């Protein structure tokens, strides 16, 4: 029997990403959508024939098995918590929530209601899977360097995405969460015992550095979040982690990099996460031992196939009671780390933005 799904939020992610994925998948039937904007609801129903509602209170567990929540970050906990409380299971991509208090709210709602599912699609990439399978050959893992660095990729500058009150933060929440979730997939989840971070915002208010491929409109307000976050972290298993998340930079293409150092060798993956067309030509995975670097085969996949795999996994996860509580357990150390990261960045002596790149 198909999973009856509702899409909550008809912005870019809900409309262009999750809706097509769910409608094209044999395990799901999209039975409803929710959006506060009347025009969006009208256009959606006219185009799809699927009924829409103004609020999640119109959804019930008798009619909906799973709600895919794609609303602005600051609404994640309010919306997901309300759905869970009615017995409807919820999928959130990232960020699951914005702070530790919110993760407690979601944990309580899940204990008495529906199941919370979460996770980045990056862990479903074929090249990331190949890297994970390689890790046992590297011996004891000592250090991981993670980066997602866009050339020109500021999302909707001036909109909610770049307003701290609504987004929670900038590139660290948007791109960094994917990297940290991928780290947990590679090494297993762990708390971070040491966190040092700095942020900068040289590009975020320069229109020329926005993500043109998203076709976002510029907002009226100046952005007050970082476009770049750089940090050094230590996990409670002793593995050190360097992290860089950047919406914009001076490089030519958008790139995602994972470098793993072990006692018996190192591994490097260079690719491009997400949907940007300004990407690396192909993923490159290599291993280095005793001065010799060997390139390893990785699958060439269509852009976005990781999201298709993620949706395929959702139905199985929903049917497995063992997944209850897992999303909260994996999100909690990430949320705590981000809180400590921003605290560290706030205590650093600020040098101010240099918005010279117009």
UniProtKB/Swiss-Prot annotation:
Q: Does the keyword Oxidoreductase apply?
A: yes
Catalytic activity line of the entry: UDP-alpha-D-glucose + NAD(+) = UDP-3-oxo-alpha-D-glucose + NADH + H(+)
Keywords on record: Antibiotic biosynthesis, NAD, Oxidoreductase
Which Enzyme Commission numbers does its entry carry?
1.1.1.-
Oligomer status and interactors = Interacts with RifK.
Q: What does this protein do?
A: In a complex with RifK, RifL may catalyze the oxidation of UDP-glucose to UDP-3-keto-D-glucose, which would then be used by RifK to produce UDP-kanosamine. Is not able to use dTDP-glucose as substrate.
Query: What's the protein here called?
Result: Putative UDP-kanosamine synthase oxidoreductase subunit
Please tell me the species this chain comes from: Amycolatopsis mediterranei (strain S699)
Q: Which gene encodes it?
A: rifL
């Amino acid at each position: 029997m198909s999973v009856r799904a509702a899409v909550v939020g008809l912005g870019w992610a809900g409309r262009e990403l999750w809706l097509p994925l769910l409608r094209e998948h044999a395990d799901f039937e999209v039975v409803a959508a929710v959006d506060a904007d009347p025009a969006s609801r009208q256009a959606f129903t006219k185009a799809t024939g699927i009924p829409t509602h103004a609020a999640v209170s119109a959804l019930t567990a008798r009619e909906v098995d799973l709600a895919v929540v794609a609303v602005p970050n600051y609404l994640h906990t309010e919306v997901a918590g309300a759905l869970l409380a009615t017995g409807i299971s919820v999928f959130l991509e990232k960020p699951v929530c914005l702070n530790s208090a919110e993760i407690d709210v979601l944990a309580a709602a899940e204990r008495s209601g529906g199941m919370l599912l979460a996770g980045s699609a990056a862990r479903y990439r074929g090249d990331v899977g190949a890297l994970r399978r390689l890790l046992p050959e590297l011996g004891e893992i000592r250090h991981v360097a993670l980066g997602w660095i866009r050339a020109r990729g500021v999302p909707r500058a001036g909109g909610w995405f770049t307003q701290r009150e609504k987004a929670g933060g900038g590139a660290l929440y948007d791109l960094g969460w994917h990297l940290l979730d991928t780290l947990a997939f590679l090494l297993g989840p762990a708390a971070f015992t040491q966190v040092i971070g700095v942020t900068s915002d040289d590009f975020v208010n320069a229109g020329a550095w926005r993500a043109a491929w998203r076709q976002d409109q510029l907002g009226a307000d100046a952005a007050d979040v970082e476009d770049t976050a750089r940090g050094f972290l230590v996990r409670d298993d002793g593995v050190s982690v360097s992290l860089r998340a950047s919406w914009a930079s001076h490089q030519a293409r958008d790139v995602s990099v994972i470098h793993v150092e072990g006692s018996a060798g190192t591994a490097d993956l260079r690719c491009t996460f997400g949907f940007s067309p300004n990407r690396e030509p192909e993923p490159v995975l290599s291993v280095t031992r005793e001065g010799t670097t060997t390139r390893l085969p990785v699958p060439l996949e269509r852009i976005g196939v990781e999201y298709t795999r993620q949706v395929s996994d959702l139905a199985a996860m929903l049917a497995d009671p063992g997944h209850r509580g897992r999303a909260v357990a994996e999100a909690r150390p990430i949320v705590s780390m981000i809180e400590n990261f921003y605290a560290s960045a706030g205590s650093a002596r600020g040098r101010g933005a240099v918005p010279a790149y117009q």
